């Protein structure tokens, strides 16, 4: 059975990933708060000890306003931690899927969705840090997969009104 390690499993995206994969794979996560306090050496040691086949890295500081007011925390979470996770993946031979953001783009130039050739021009600290994180991860681990996700939301459990689903 494949061993998958999920970072940020207590967060919005990570908790849903953990829920979906549990029971189908051997899934582990890091303790809550571990990434906020860890050093590069401690993170590398922990991930080498876990020795996963796959690392899913959705952990981030994603509140755009918070990142503007706390750029040092944003840099650590969105640039350094992904780089450290990529180093652990490189050392252990794990596959890496790291989450980035559509905030690396400047805006929609028409009705087409973004692709790999779209202009990158982040307009805020969060977007700049996510782009720098992407570049540093791919510089170290070119085979890593980076997912530029858009705004993630869920209705249940987050106080958002349920308006119903429309069938396709």
Positions of PLM-derived features:
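NAD(P)-dependent short-chain dehydrogenase/reductase
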Residues: 138-168
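N-terminal Rossmann NAD(P)H-binding glycine-rich loop of SDR-like oxidoreductase domains
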Residues: 2-22
